[in-house]
Amino acid sequence: MHPIEQLRAIARAGDIDSTFLAIEAADALAELASEPRALVPACRRLLEHHHLAGPLWWLCAQVLGSPDPAAAAEQAAAQLIEDPTAEELAGCLPGAAVVAAPCSATVCDALAGRPDCHAHLVGEPLALRRALRSIGQGAAGGAEVLGYGPSQPDEVLDGASLLIVEPAVAGPSGAILSESAANLAEVGRAMGVALWLVAGVGKVLPAPLFANCLSGGVDHRLLAVEDITAVIGPSGPTEPTKALAAGDVPCPPELAYRPTGG
């Protein structure tokens, strides 16, 4: 498939994990690097369709901000694939913790290695089935899991010692969460439950790029940095203000605009 066609397919993709989309897009952008005038519109098209996908913003910034776009795309893909955040999260969880969290690949990978923990996971039926299968395939059997629908925040947080959420994207002023994750965070705050933000490779952007995301869709909300207890990322746990100010990608002028898509 020609890289332009591959990128169009990625742009049209529905509700798919943004890290997976960025890895797929990196391959196509690396091939497209020989046509430099096509790179900017290709990146903008991706972001018009997935304007809250932190890893895609991060990838496009790496590619457009590099004198060697092909090498930058390949290096970015490798970083996304080798992201150690799940392992860092697994190592940070307190012993026998009761963890509440929306379903996400990073959280499930971490829980797969912690059979001493208990998990209250939130998601639609298909997502919950996938999560149960993923966690159960851990070498040690994984955490014990109970599944809940998105409309049950009080039940999810009952008895929980820790709430873990993964943002669409984050930056210096906070993190953009799905509506259901934001509802959980609000209920958890009222109940005094500690909140950890899991922000893997590509999820934290510098202020100029994060500003482009703040017009987000009606189904997403901003979680303020002061409402976060800790951020778990590729380097392990970090104080929230420091972690969310650590977006270290270029801010190419070609991305200094606000996408209108959703």
Feature map (PLM): residue ranges:
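Long amphipathic alpha-helical segments
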Residues: 1-74
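Glycine/charged-rich beta-loop-alpha catalytic/anionic-binding loops adjacent to active sites
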Residues: 4-11, 116-118, 165-171
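Small/polar-residue-rich loop-to-helix segments that shape phosphate-bearing ligand pockets
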Residues: 66-83, 136
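A short, well-structured juxtamembrane/interface segment
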Residues: 77-95, 103-109
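Glycine-rich phosphate/diphosphate-binding loops that line cofactor/substrate pockets in enzymes
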Residues: 88-98, 114, 159
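Short glycine-rich phosphate-binding loop at a beta-alpha junction
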Residues: 97-102, 119-121
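Histidine-anchored nucleotide/phosphate-binding helix
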Residues: 104-115, 183-186
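Conserved phosphate- and dinucleotide-binding cores of soluble alpha/beta proteins
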Residues: 123-262
